[in-house]
From Swiss-Prot:
One annotated Gene Ontology cellular component of this protein: photosystem II
Ranges that cross the membrane: 27-47, 89-109, 142-162, 203-223, 243-263, 307-327
Cofactor: divinyl chlorophyll a; divinyl chlorophyll b
Something else known: This low-light-adapted strain contains 7 pcb genes.
Cellular localization per UniProt: Cellular thylakoid membrane
Identification of the protein by name: Divinyl chlorophyll a/b light-harvesting protein PcbB
Pfam short name (any one): PSII
Keyword Endoplasmic reticulum: no
Membrane topology designation: Multi-pass membrane protein
Alphabetical GO biological process terms: photosynthetic electron transport chain
Function recorded in the entry: The antenna complex functions as a light receptor, it captures and delivers excitation energy to photosystems II and I. The Prochlorales pcb genes are not related to higher plant LHCs.
Keyword Mitochondrion in record: no
Length: 352
């Protein structure tokens, strides 16, 4: 974390990142616990939505988030946009709750029973392999490689699910199996207009390509190291906990903004049966998405409206967080801003 040259800086209890910044074991514990919290939310909220789901009302008009995504994956025996077999959704929700407990227990175990610093383990041991320093590009790229491989495997799982189980096709109005279209020309051409994609085969082809690309990239990052000396030209002095946090916030913010625009207008991936009609982008004090369905009651909103607007504003603030932490990582002291305003208030003009 940025300390501005103060070696004995202290942090308040709510500065959670400070507790893991220089302790790789605690960092893993926080990762596991965080993943457990996300899985707990997904499982608990799915059960909550199932309890209040009304099959007589369009799913997109019930302010649901989890169930529309499960329905889009062809789960729930969907007929005419209605869940007819909620058992599958219940199983998935309960599994998420169970795994959230496992991950939470793992976080507690790593935090209380195992060493807070993986560097204290013997050389050659598996924990030692994942010990890292924020300014060590070789170890960071080694860990990045493992992340990329897991993302690639997740893409493979999605592609195989669509190919053998099937996902919802809004054009057909039914769940069907989808084979991936691995046309590299199509993938290249959709770089700029992927928000307008209308073919599920193309969607799966993009995920299949990503799976291959991420796994190859992951293997590359695991087995390779810096070529030559690590110099300032290559970025020496720029890597730090704060810098990596800023990169992460930028990535999450970008993904959130893409999700906002994609979910607001695309009906191939976000079907109208589950998310409601497409939205219109408007500008006031800030940009926002509005519903276009005239049948909605006053003050009511579709799941698409909630999804797009929440992602848009979260993405916006994530980008602001990226800029904040990136500037701090570069050495900018925001305390100077307050001092500048104080100096302006205390400044006096004298007549010579």
């Amino acid at each position: 974390m940025q300390t501005y040259g103060n070696p004995s800086v202290t942090y308040d209890w709510y500065a959670g990142n400070s507790g893991t910044a220089n302790r790789s074991g605690k960092f893993i514990a926080a990762h596991a616990a965080h993943a457990g919290l996300m899985m707990f939310w997904a499982g608990a909220f799915t059960l909550f939505e199932l309890a209040r789901y009304d099959s007589s009302v369009a799913m997109g008009n019930q302010n649901l988030i989890c169930l529309p995504h499960l329905a889009q994956l062809g789960i729930g025996g969907i007929e005419n946009g209605v869940i007819t077999e909620p058992y599958g959704c219940t199983v998935i929700a309960v599994l998420h709750l169970i795994f959230s407990g496992v991950l939470g227990a793992g976080g507690i175990l790593h935090s209380t029973r195992y060493d807070g610093d993986l560097g204290n383990y013997p050389e050659g041991s598996r924990p030692k392999k994942f010990d890292f320093e924020w300014d060590d590009p070789d170890k960071l790229t080694f860990i990045l490689g493992h992340h990329l491989i897991f993302l690639g495997l997740a893409n493979i799982q999605f592609v195989e699910w669509a190919q053998y189980h099937g996902i919802w096709d809004t054009a057909l109005g039914a769940t069907r199996t989808v084979s991936y279209n691995l046309d590299l020309g199509m993938i290249w051409n959709h770089q700029a207009d992927f928000l307008q994609i209308t073919s599920l085969e193309d969607v799966m082809g993009g995920h299949a390509f990503l799976a291959f690309f991420q796994i190859i990239g992951g293997a590359f990052h695991i087995i390779t190291k810096q070529f030559g000396e690590y110099t300032e030209f290559k970025g020496k002095g720029l890597l730090s906990a704060e810098a990596v946090l800023s990169y992460s916030l930028a990535g999450v913010g970008y993904c959130a903004l893409v999700a906002a625009f994609w979910s607001s207008t695309n009906t191939t991936v976000y079907s109208t049966e589950f998310f409601g009609e497409v939205l219109q982008l408007k500008f006031d004090f800030a940009p926002y998405f509005v519903d276009t369905d005239p049948s909605l009651a006053a003050g009511a909103h579709t799941a698409r409206a909630w999804l797009a607007n929440v992602h848009f504003y979260l993405g916006f603030f994530f980008i602001q967080g990226h800029l904040w932490h990136a500037l701090r990582a570069m050495g900018f002291d925001f305390r100077r801003v307050g001092k500048a305003f104080d100096n302006m208030e205390n400044a006096k003009i004298t007549n010579g």
